[in-house]
């Protein structure tokens, strides 16, 4: 039997209607440092977790704040297609960014999860191995 490599959570994003308040709360509570980054259409507060950036806080019209985990995969297109076959709804089709490819799906139970395929020069921080 061959071993299957587990897919680690490598990035966390908080989607909230109060980015500034959330940034202050987590800075005070957990000493998470935030850095504002211009992401084109909106600013993004990157989170320094354990000395490296591994998350972010995004301003969005949310009924309630939601944490979105990004799971590293080998082939984002294949995993997104497999999730769809298993009953997930694709919220964001696989797309390329500066450091990799990502997609987002809603699970059959209504949760959301993002898939991340890094480019060779970029590796996630590995929050959970």
Where are these predicted regions, by residue range?
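N-terminal beta-strand motif that seeds the catalytic metal site of vicinal oxygen chelate
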Residues: 1-23, 67-69, 118-129
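Residue-level hotspots at or immediately adjacent to binding/recognition sites across diverse folds
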Residues: 11, 19, 36-40, 48-49, ...
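Vicinal oxygen chelate
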Residues: 19, 70-112
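Catalytic core of tubulin tyrosine ligase-like
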Residues: 26
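Short secondary-structure junctions
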Residues: 31-37, 89-94
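Conserved short beta-strand elements that form part of the metal-binding/catalytic scaffold
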Residues: 32-66, 105, 112-118
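Conserved, structured core segments of small domains
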Residues: 48-62, 69-72, 81-84, 91-92, ...
């Amino acid at each position: 039997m061959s071993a299957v490599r587990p897919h680690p959570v490598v990035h966390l994003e908080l989607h909230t209607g109060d980015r500034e308040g959330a940034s202050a709360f987590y800075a005070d509570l957990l000493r998470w440092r935030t850095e504002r980054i211009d992401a084109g259409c909106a600013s993004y507060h990157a989170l320094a977790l354990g000395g490296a950036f591994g998350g972010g806080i995004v301003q969005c019209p949310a009924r309630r704040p939601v944490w979105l985990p990004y799971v590293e995969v080998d082939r984002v297109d294949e995993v997104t297609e497999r999730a769809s076959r298993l009953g997930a709804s694709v919220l964001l089709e696989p797309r390329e960014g500066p450091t990799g490819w990502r997609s987002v799906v809603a699970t059959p139970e209504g949760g959301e999860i993002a898939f991340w395929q890094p480019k060779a020069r970029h590796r996630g921080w590995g929050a959970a191995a």
